[in-house]
Structures are given as C-alpha cells and as structure tokens.
Amino acid sequence: MTIMARARGRRSSVQASDWETVVHQSFALRARGFVFLLAALLAGLVPGSALLKAQEAPTAVIHIGLILPTAGTTPLQAAIAKSAADGMTYAEDDFQLNAELVGIDFKIVKETASGAAAVTAAADKLVAAGAFGVMGGFNYAEAKALGDWSKAKNVPFINLAASSDLLRNQQCTPTMFHMAPSAAMYMDALAGWYVRSNLRQWYIVYEDTDEGRAQYERFRASIRDRHFGAREVGATRLAVGASGGTSLVSAVRRANADAIFLLMGAEGQLRILAELDKGGITAQTTGFPYPETQLREFYEMSAKAAPTLGVGHCAAAWEGTIDAYGAREWNARYSSLFNEPLQMPAWSIYHAVKTFYESAVFGGGDTSAANIIAHMTNQDNVFDLHKGLGSTFRPWDRQLRQSLYLVKINANPKDRISGAILVGELPAIYMPGTELVERLDQLGDMQRQTKCK
C-alpha cells in the first residue's frame, strides 16, 4: 500500500483543516515534480477541461516495470532489498498523486527476483502486465541479462545499480540506459579526490574476475592519464574469496603507498580491511563503491572490522545528508516516512521512475519504445536528479551524466543518519568558463574511448 493510500484510509479520523494542511505540505514538497505536469497540460496531453473528469477518463496509460531484489541471505542483501522497496513506495506515492491530478493511469508494476535467469523471466511478466519499460539490475550478471533481454524484446531498460564498464562498452545495447554511475565515473572521482589531497602513490588489490581486471586497467589509466604525478606502486590480484594474509601486508608496507584501493565486493573489502588493519597498515584505504558498500550497514561493518582503516572515505552516488539543490526536503521527507536515510537503491529507483514517467508525459503519452528511447537520448531533454545539475544520457553509451559524492565513515555515529559525513562532490557545481556537459564529462569514458557499437 502506498503512503498516500494509507493516508486516504485515515482521512476520516482527522479534521478537514488537518487534512488540508497535510495536502498543502505534500504539495509544497512535490513542487519540483509539477513542472513536467504543467508542461503536459500546455502540450495538450491533458486538456484543461479534462481535469474535472480526470478520475473518470484517463488520458494516458503509464505503467512502469520494476524488478526488486530478493532479501537474500546476508544483512547487506536485506538492506539493499529494503532500501529498494522503500524507494519504490516513495516514488509510487509522488507520481501516483501527480498522475491523478491530470487523469493519467499510472502504475509501478513490480516483480521480485534475483539472478540472471530469474530477472529475465520477471521482465517478461512485467511486459505481459502492461509495462512499457523495465527497471532492474542490482549486479553485473542481472544487468547484463536484462540488457540482452531488452534488445531482443525492444523494451527500454534502465540499469539501476550495476556499475560495470563492460555494460557501457562491449556489452552495450541500444535499449539499455544507466541510472547507476559507471565504474569509470566512480574511479575517476576517487582518483581526483585523493590526488587533490596529495595522495598519489597507489597500491591496488583486485579480484581475478572479468570485472575486477577491467576495473584495475581502467583505474590505472585514470591515474596515468588524468593526474600528474600519480602512479601505481604495487598491485595484488586475488581469487574471489581469498585472503591477502601477511604477504599482502608486507607488500603494501614495502610499496610505501599513500592510498590503497580495494577492487572487490563488500565481503572482500571487509576481509582485506581487517587484515591490513591488523597488520598495522595506516595508508588511506578505500574500496570500489558497489551498491552494498554505499549503505549505513556497510559503514558500520567497516568501522567494526577495521577501527583504523575502516573509517576512511568512500564514493557514493547519493548521500542522505545532502542539504542543497532541493535535496534537503527530499531527504528529510524520506527519513520521516521510513525512519532511514535515503540511500543509493532508493535514490536510483525513484529517479528511474521519474525518467520513464517524464519521457512518457513529455512524449504526449506515447509509450512506444521508439518514442521513449528518442526522448531519453535527446540531448535537449534534461533530467533533475536532485543533484543541482541537469543531467542527460550520453549518446555514445547511454550513461546518465551526474555528479558523485565523497563521504567519510563516522566512527561514532549517534544514529543511522550520522553514520556518514558528506565531505565532497565532483565535479564542482560552479566552474566559471565551463559548460554543463563539459563539467559532468570530467567523470567516465568519453566518446573517443567507447567500445559501444
């Protein structure tokens, strides 16, 4: 049940004046969302006289498919699933209210599935239920499977959380778009932040997988080509699930590194952090920002596993304490509703819904694949991500341009909200003499580098 549905169910227990106050407050918090609805009215999608009959005769059908992750078997998987479900409810509340005002038949059609085979079966069910586009992908395998599925079925797909550069290059498809920042974007941002702090000598620990090796090569290119004086002073390749042990500790110490980068999943990062911390390593250490590592639950685990190294800096697609660009109210309302900070999975789902919804509304209610894809790839169409800069999808790999955040893990938080401290943003919002796209394209692979065909 949506938030608004629960509110409607309680309406009889409050006074009319109280209800009006609630509605006015809700409208104020949603003010940014009404811009595209006004545009729809002006464009003739919903004639003004039709507003009085909005509930009787929907003027457009906008049904969006969402594949939620299962709760899994670990606390981090459960946290991802909860954030995703809450993000869906948050988006459903906002856009259902907006749609009702102009007579749009709006619905988020959902399935819950994890794993490549399961998510493609779920995607088929969503389309059969009337969804014109599908959102999903909480890891590389799922996003790869859904990208291939979307191409075969000619259904627009938004990748919510998988960062692999392979999906934006050799494995790209014309129907797959990326809400999640790419690995290249994350790594360029981290390199920029650390090098600007005069941490230039890097030791890299990476997993022996296709994705791990690709991340390693891309990060080496970032520090070599973009940052004068930065260099790799050592590297260790580990099998998935393997420990580094005393040999890794000795290698890092001999390398005299300023910074250590762990290119592996959440469990691997926690394991290596603990080993290095126990071995007395003090170099600044960070890990690749997979979705699981952008959660308050991970920050708490990191601080516990490695009291010295585990309270360092991390990159994030979103941070629940951002208080600029309209994000303050947006974050605060989410926290008041769910008693949680707004985290990456919820952020990604909300804005993927918003992207599909706006593309359909601005397209006159035409939800054909050709129309939706044309709107999303049009460089004149800007999407607001609550990040202060209007965003567009890069035409060469359909990656959404956006800024990223640097947070520091709080070793002694007083509550979940304060579990992370926002300390930086890249690219800088205000850079005189530069264009918007130029600023955002500081992060990630440019057209000359793409292998997307």
Predicted regions and their residues:
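Extracytosolic ligand-binding ectodomains
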Residues: 2-11, 17-20, 24-27, 34-41, ...
